[in-house]
């Protein structure tokens, strides 16, 4: 008898005798739409029970709002978990960091009562830096596009990731090393950008003096976060990752080119923190009870009417980072099925259900159709195709009563429960929480 017959096939052997390297898993919170779903509130809710909260990608183009003990905190680079003084917050290697903005954010939130950050914030030495000239270039590139702009935040995120991809970016660790080498690299990257964009003006010596000071300020926070996280997992520490932006803004899977410059899906968690796939535990998709989008780009369920105005007003849909009004529309099931395929949600948190309280009926997109009437079995891969689809809606009854004070799922109006169950059924993913207000106490546990 052959060895393979005795011990199984090679594939079966591959899965035998696995050793468990890690004592804990990494749970992930991801935006399931175009951002602004309420990820920060979900992270804040879960962070009270975890040891470490991480940001893995993006920069200060993200905006998360957390209400804790009646105080509203706005975060752009800091993980929302910093509100919990018992956990460590990590800014991973996949994040791009504008140091002036980071320290401004720290000061503003310290003024609101945030304390002892120096003991519980860790920044990756491999994270890339965003410089002021990146921001200037971002604004210039948007202006050059005229009416075809992408609607970026002009925070320099795209140009910084571009520097990273072309291998002339500068990482935090280089700022803390030999400053002469940092100075040479900085002069080189400035020269490259001035050559490409002659109108930008950079006072190199003034910037170097400024960054010499920033080196001293940031030094106490910087570590090898990859080693830190793997050690934590081996020791059974609980880790939560806060995704920035959202799946439909992902550079690969979003509505390209109307996207951000990083991977905001599950893959970005792994590359942005240096984690292998087997460390991932729960993947929580955060879904707003309707759909919003900031900036330009296709939006199949957008409502340019009284419904859109009502959602914008009741939901106070204004961007935390951009201060722009968000575009509003109905919940989009085909979009959510697509992002669930990409991210593999194990459960969902529905937020802002209370914003729908006044509506007599609520529409939900259930299918996309070609102009011929044929239903699409996939999410369109180009904006041209997405802009040419027709949307098929299901019409569900509203509940026309306030849900803001409800704290038990079974006490929600029957039609509100049905709305949540409809979403759950369509996606075949359990809804674990429902949000009906701003504070952490307004999140209802469904199961």
Curated annotation (Swiss-Prot):
Signal peptide: none annotated. Keywords: Cytoplasm, GTP-binding, Ligase, Magnesium, Metal-binding, Nucleotide-binding, Purine biosynthesis. Substrate binds at residues 320-326. Pathway: Purine metabolism; AMP biosynthesis via de novo pathway; AMP from IMP: step 1/2. GO terms for biological process: 'de novo' AMP biosynthetic process; IMP metabolic process. Mg(2+) binds at residues 36, 63. It comes from the Eukaryota. GO terms for cellular component: cytoplasm. Its main location: cytoplasm. PROSITE patterns: ADENYLOSUCCIN_SYN_1, ADENYLOSUCCIN_SYN_2. InterPro entries: Adenylosuccin_syn_GTP-bd, Adenylosuccin_syn_Lys_AS, Adenylosuccinate_synth_dom1, Adenylosuccinate_synth_dom2, Adenylosuccinate_synth_dom3, Adenylosuccinate_synthetase, P-loop_NTPase. It is an enzyme of class 6 (ligase). Its EC number is 6.3.4.4. Its cofactor is Mg(2+). Belongs to the adenylosuccinate synthetase family. This is Adenylosuccinate synthetase. The lineage of its organism: Eukaryota, Metazoa, Ecdysozoa, Arthropoda, Hexapoda.
């Amino acid at each position: 008898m052959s060895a393979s017959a005795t011990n199984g096939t090679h594939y079966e052997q591959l899965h035998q005798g696995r050793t468990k390297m890690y004592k804990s898993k990494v749970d992930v919170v991801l935006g399931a739409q175009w951002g602004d779903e309420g990820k920060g509130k979900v992270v804040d809710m879960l962070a009270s029970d975890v040891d470490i909260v991480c940001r893995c990608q993006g920069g200060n183009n993200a905006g998360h709002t957390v209400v804790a003990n009646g105080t509203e905190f706005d975060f752009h680079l800091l993980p929302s978990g910093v509100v919990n003084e018992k956990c460590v917050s990590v800014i991973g290697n996949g994040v791009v960091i504008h140091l002036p903005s980071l320290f401004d954010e720290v000061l503003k939130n310290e003024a609101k009562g945030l304390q002892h950050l120096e003991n519980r914030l860790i920044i990756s030495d491999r994270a890339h830096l965003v410089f002021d000239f990146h921001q200037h270039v971002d604004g210039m590139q948007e202006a050059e596009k005229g009416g075809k702009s992408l609607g970026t935040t002009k925070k320099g995120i795209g140009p910084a990731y571009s520097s990273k991809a072309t291998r002339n970016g500068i990482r935090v660790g280089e700022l803390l090393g030999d400053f002469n080498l940092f100075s040479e690299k900085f002069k080189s990257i400035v020269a490259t950008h001035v050559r490409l964009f002659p109108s930008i003006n950079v006072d190199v010596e003034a910037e170097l003096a400024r960054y010499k000071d920033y080196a001293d300020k940031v030094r106490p926070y910087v570590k090898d976060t990859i080693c830190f996280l793997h050690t934590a997992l081996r020791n059974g520490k609980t880790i939560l990752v806060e995704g920035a932006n959202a799946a439909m803004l992902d550079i690969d899977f979003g509505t390209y080119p109307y996207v951000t410059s990083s991977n905001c899906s599950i893959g970005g968690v792994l590359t942005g923190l240096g984690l292998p796939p087997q460390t991932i535990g729960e993947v929580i998709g955060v879904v707003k009870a309707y759909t919003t989008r900031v900036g330009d780009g296709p939006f199949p369920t957008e409502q340019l009417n009284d419904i859109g105005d009502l959602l914008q007003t009741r939901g106070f849909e204004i961007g935390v980072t951009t201060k722009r009004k968000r575009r509003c529309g109905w919940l989009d099931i085909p979009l959510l099925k697509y992002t669930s395929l990409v991210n593999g949600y194990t459960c969902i948190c529905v937020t802002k259900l209370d914003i729908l309280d006044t509506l007599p009926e609520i529409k939900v997109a259930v299918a996309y159709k070609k102009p011929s009437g044929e239903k699409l079995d996939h999410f369109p891969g180009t904006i041209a195709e997405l802009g040419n689809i027709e949307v098929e809606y299901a019409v569900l009854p509203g509940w026309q009563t306030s849900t803001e004070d409800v704290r038990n799922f079974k006490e929600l109006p029957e039609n509100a429960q049905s709305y949540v169950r409809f979403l759950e059924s369509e996606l075949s993913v359990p809804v674990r929480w429902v949000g009906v207000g701003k504070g952490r106490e307004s999140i209802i546990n469904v199961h």
